[in-house]
Amino acid sequence: MSENNCSKPSFPDNAASKEYAASLDAADPLASFRDQFIIPSKANIACKRLAKPNLSPEPCIYFCGNSLGIQPKATAKYLEAQLDTWSSIGVCGHFTNLEDSPMKSWQLLAEQAAESMSKIVGADPAEVAAMGTLTANLHLLMASFYKPTATKHKILMDWKAFPSDHYAIESHIAWHNLDPKESMVLIGPDEGEYEISTDKILSYIDQHAEDAALLLLPGIQYYTGQLFDIPKITEYAKSRNLVVGWDLAHAYGNVELKLHDWNVDFAAWCTYKYGNAGPGAMAGLFVHDKHGQVDYSQGEDSPKFRHRLTGWYGGDRSVRFKMDNKFKPIPGAGGFQISNPSAIDLSCLCAALSVFDQTSVSELRRKSLKLTAYLEYLLLKDTTEDSRPFRIITPTNPEARGAQLSLLLKPGLLQGVSERLQDAGIICDKREPGVVRVAPVPLYNTYSEVWEFVQQFRAALQL
């Protein structure tokens, strides 16, 4: 994927020193953002009871933002404001904009979140909706965009899709009385490899252009951390008359996206990883403007719009409370909403987005490129491919990855390495049978933490 300043950084001879890592932190223009988050302490992550933040002054090293981001300090403030609104004015909170609240009234709150998210995914605000959860949103989008016929029914997807995506796709195929064994086409890497080349994806598109109805891929592959060339793949697939959707769970808040300009048909994402909106937080979806049009040329009572599963909250606010059972959708992605969204969930999402509103994904990406490159440099320094008991299965090309590096350990090493990292107060994700996923997040992680992680990781492997 073409990105600005995406060449791999080079490092000087003293780059492996603790002092050099500290110098990078001192020069980091985004360093102050770390103060806007609550970093779990080493004492707390070992505690067996509920604990207050900062039980001890020593923070853990949290490299698990690709699984769950940490809590912004704004979250408690936003939640308290919402609880005060509910307790003080009850149902009036739906329509009352309180002057000292950081959030709009409840009926406008989803739009507030969607506007901020649109900047993160490169879309017009009307093309984004804050709603539901990732898999539920994928179901809703596939209900609208997956229209199989007898001859054009296949879905092209990732060979190692996150299981929830696999289940969702499989169930939609079965819903149409089709056989998943015939209608699911898994695109995988060459034997012994983990990276899927863009050329291979394009070749699958060519091979199935006549019988595929949908291409649905992850923007970033959750296991390997590979960032796919979204614009190139999208353009090519659409030239072959495929509908194109993307699961951006690991791309949202991680890499630059331009969904509108790339002409993506639809996309969905969760907000609790790099988005920091909390466990199981409200998700988001994108529907390109051309699919969200509402045509009233045949009269106000006969709107024409793309078929979707509907609910009252997708209806235009001007008629939402008329209760006349005449559905008039909100133009754009908002028309795909189903139910009244949780104001509590939206509070957590808006709190997380308030941090992103202070910067840009391009600035975060610039730091992320250097942070992850530094991690890679330290991991590989003074080793050879034969001497290393691990392999980085994430692409070495910075244009083909986000913040995450996936480290595939030799058989039998995962448990011992995981225990060593945990004892050192380092939180990162492990995936059986042998992968450690490490994700330094530019909003709150430091170069010094990268340095310390590598010391502990190498010690665990006796390097």
Curated annotation (Swiss-Prot):
It is found in: Cytoplasm. GO terms for biological process: 'de novo' NAD biosynthetic process from L-tryptophan; anthranilate metabolic process; L-kynurenine catabolic process; L-tryptophan catabolic process to kynurenine; quinolinate biosynthetic process. The keyword Cytoplasm applies. Keywords: Cytoplasm, Hydrolase, Pyridine nucleotide biosynthesis, Pyridoxal phosphate. The keyword Transferase does not apply. Pathway: Amino-acid degradation; L-kynurenine degradation; L-alanine and anthranilate from L-kynurenine: step 1/1; Cofactor biosynthesis; NAD(+) biosynthesis; quinolinate from L-kynurenine: step 2/3. Its EC number is 3.7.1.3. Pfam families: Aminotran_5, KYNU_C. Its cofactor is pyridoxal 5'-phosphate. GO terms for molecular function: kynureninase activity; pyridoxal phosphate binding. GO terms for cellular component: cytoplasm. SUPFAM superfamilies: PLP-dependent transferases. It catalyses: L-kynurenine + H2O = anthranilate + L-alanine + H(+); 3-hydroxy-L-kynurenine + H2O = 3-hydroxyanthranilate + L-alanine + H(+). The modification N6-(pyridoxal phosphate)lysine is found at residue 273. Pyridoxal 5'-phosphate binds at residues 134-135, 162-165, 247, 250, 272, 312, 340. Homodimer. Catalyzes the cleavage of L-kynurenine (L-Kyn) and L-3-hydroxykynurenine (L-3OHKyn) into anthranilic acid (AA) and 3-hydroxyanthranilic acid (3-OHAA), respectively. Belongs to the kynureninase family. This is Kynureninase 2.
